[in-house]
Regions:
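N-terminal post-signal-peptidase region of extra-cytosolic proteins
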Residues: 66-67, 84-99
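A short, Trp-centered hydrophobic/proline-enriched beta-strand micro-motif
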Residues: 73-88
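Bacterial Sec-dependent N-terminal signal peptides
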Residues: 1-29
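Sec-dependent signal peptide cleavage junction
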Residues: 19-74
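Mid-length scaffold segments of soluble, non-membrane domains
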Residues: 94-147
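Helix-rich interaction surfaces within compact, conserved domain-sized segments
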Residues: 23-34, 138-208
Length: 208
């Protein structure tokens, strides 16, 4: 009788253990499933971020292309303004400036060069710098194999006699202009963007 009772207890224990194993997943299986789910979530987020970056890059490239075409057309029409937000002096000193008051503007045979700094005095142009106006001659445009546009010209007038070199790279309206005075070595470089005249919002001070 005792042996029968012990046998029944053993059988019941085996049945209970089997039932528990069938109805509850093991911790290892749970962790594996959770890990795979997390991995899929992370991979999904990375894929979305990559797709978003690609979309943003493509949109920016389209915008840059439009701006570049506008700038190139304006340069060919000799009707543009380079609005600068940085001025680099002869020995590499840099001044960050307001693009509304620092520019080189060309309108057919006339050019205006203006610089204005954040200083406590008005200067000759009344806004902290100098504004000069002159006639354009020797206007030339060259585009190399890489699509870089180089514009060269001479500007002569009251207070200015200089060679001007403008460089604009393929696919962007970002540009720089080097101003090389004919009677001194005080070279000046302005970095900014080229805009058609009708889109430029510069403020002109008093000319010399």
């Amino acid at each position: 009788m005792k042996k029968i009772f012990l046998s029944l207890l053993l059988i019941m224990s085996m049945i209970t253990s089997f039932s528990y194993a069938q109805s509850n997943p093991s911790d290892d299986m749970y962790q594996i499933t959770k890990s795979k789910a997390n991995e899929q979530l992370v991979n999904g987020l990375k894929a979305r971020q990559k797709a978003l970056k690609n979309e943003q890059r493509a949109l920016q490239n389209r915008i840059d292309s439009v701006l570049w075409n506008e700038a190139l057309t304006a340069v060919k029409d000799t009707a543009f303004t380079l609005e600068a937000d940085k001025v680099v002096f002869k020995y590499g000193q840099i001044a960050y400036v307001n693009s509304n008051t620092n520019f080189v503007s060309v309108n057919k045979d006339n050019a205006i060069v203006q610089v204005a700094f954040n200083v406590p005095f008005a200067g000759p142009n009344g806004i902290g710098g100098v504004t000069v106006q002159g006639s354009v001659s020797g206007y030339k445009i060259q585009i190399d194999k890489k699509g870089t546009t180089l514009v060269t010209m001479n500007v002569t007038g009251v207070g200015i006699s200089a060679q001007i070199w403008i460089t604009m790279y393929q696919g962007t309206h970002d540009a720089n202009v080097e101003i090389l005075p004919n009677f001194s070595s005080e070279r000046l470089t302005l970095n900014g963007v080229i805009l058609p005249l009708h889109k430029s919002t510069v403020y002109q001070g008093r000319t010399l």
